[in-house]
Amino acid sequence: MQMRVNINNSQYVKGITLMKNIFNHLHTEEILTRIDKLNPNSQPQWGRMDVAQMLAHCSAFQDIAMGNSFPPRGWLGRLIGRFVKPILYNDKPIPRDMSTIPTILITEKKEFDTEREKLKQKIIVFQNDGPEKCTTHSHPFFGKLSSEEWGKGIYKHLDHHLKQFGV
């Protein structure tokens, strides 16, 4: 009998920590359920984005992972990206107020219902397509990622922003 205990973004199985991954159907369902708990009046516990902007930001991140958007790598990412890459897929929380890729920083007003549905559909498509259809293009800051790193990173990114809004 295996004992499973949830620890932050991970599962603990007999001494092995397994990071949650958006390619796992149960982890995707958990994220979608949490997104459904948001409402237009959800307030951030940190950061400057409102809830609709956060949903649009997460959707823009999905576009990168799906190979629909190709932001250029900046000099800082080229310099230190590969060294800090584990931030994306280790079991430690993403630091609050960590700076983001400028091309997915959302400052204009967005419509909540539209952004929520758009993000949910992108997550579903990404999960259904599976790791084999994940982009082979580099992340604009962290550089080359395997599909497993993308899957863990997407889960962790979504989890970070959902916690930002209390769900």
Label the model's feature ranges:
Residues 18-53, 57:
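Long, hydrophobic N-terminal alpha-helical segment
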Residues 43-89, 136-167:
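Short, contiguous alpha-helical
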